[in-house]
C-alpha cells in the first residue's frame, strides 16, 4: 500500500484543522483552537488504489514558523489553504509556495490551492482571482467548506493525484537520463 505524506499549510484561522478533521473523522469542529502541529492517518481508495494518507496539519501562526522547514522537507504534497473571507490569507499563499519550493529545492512541487469557508455569504476573494493564481502556479484549485464537507475529499484526493503525476514524470525523466547514448559505436581497428 502506497503512503502519501500530505501537508496542510496556510495562515492561522483558515480552517486547516477543520478540513483535516472533516476528512478523517467526518465531523466539523467549529471552535478555533490554534494548532501547533497534528498528524493524522487514514486509509482510502483513490482511483482504485488503496493508499494511506499521512496528513500533517500545521500551525498557521507566525510564532511557529521556525518549524515549517522541517515539515516542508518531509512532505510530498501540499494543500495551500486560504479562507475566502480573508484577503490576507490569500495573499500569504505566495509566501508559503515560495518557501516550499526553496526548502524542497525544486521548481515543481505537488500542490493544490484550496479556497475554504465557501459556505460563508461574504467572500473577500472571488473564485476568478483564485483560479488565476492557480493557473499561474500550474496547480489545481478546489473550493471547499469544512462545515458542509463540500470539496473536502476532492482537495485531498486531487493532491494525491498530483503527487502520482509528479512521481510518474520524475520516473520518466530518470529513465531517459539513464539510457545509454547508442548513436556512437566504438570499433577497434
UniProtKB/Swiss-Prot annotation:
Span of the signal peptide: none
Tissue: Expressed in the posterior termini of the embryo, restricted mainly to the embryonic central nervous system, and in the eye imaginal disk.
GO biological processes: border follicle cell migration; cell fate determination; cellular response to starvation; chorion-containing eggshell pattern formation; compound eye development; defense response to virus; determination of adult lifespan; dorsal closure
GO MF annotations in UniProt: G protein activity; GDP binding; GTP binding; GTPase activity; protein kinase regulator activity; protein serine/threonine kinase activator activity
Membrane-spanning ranges: none
Gene Ontology cellular-component terms listed: membrane; plasma membrane
Pro-sequence residue ranges: 187-189
Keywords: Cell membrane, GTP-binding, Hydrolase, Lipoprotein, Membrane, Methylation, Nucleotide-binding, Prenylation
Chain positions recorded as GTP binding sites: 10-17, 57-61, 116-119
Bilayer topology: Lipid-anchor
Segments carrying motif Effector region: 32-40
EC supergroup of this enzyme: hydrolase
Catalytic activity, as annotated: GTP + H2O = GDP + phosphate + H(+)
Activity regulation comment: Alternates between an inactive form bound to GDP and an active form bound to GTP. Activated by a guanine nucleotide-exchange factor (GEF) and inactivated by a GTPase-activating protein (GAP).
First-listed, main subcellular location of the protein, grouped into a coarse class: membrane
Lipidation (S-geranylgeranyl cysteine): 186
SUPFAM superfamilies from the UniProt entry: P-loop containing nucleoside triphosphate hydrolases
Modified positions (Cysteine methyl ester) in chain numbering: 186
Matches recorded under InterPro entries: P-loop_NTPase (IPR027417), Small_GTP-bd (IPR005225), Small_GTPase (IPR001806), Small_GTPase_Ras-type (IPR020849)
Location(s) in or outside the cell: Cell membrane
Family note: Belongs to the small GTPase superfamily. Ras family.
Function: Ras proteins bind GDP/GTP and possess intrinsic GTPase activity. Plays a role in eye development by regulating cell growth, survival of postmitotic ommatidial cells and differentiation of photoreceptor cells. During larval development, mediates Ptth/tor signaling leading to the production of ecdysone, a hormone required for the initiation of metamorphosis.
NCBIfam families noted in UniProt: small_GTP
Name of the protein in its database record: Ras-like protein 1
Gene: Ras85D
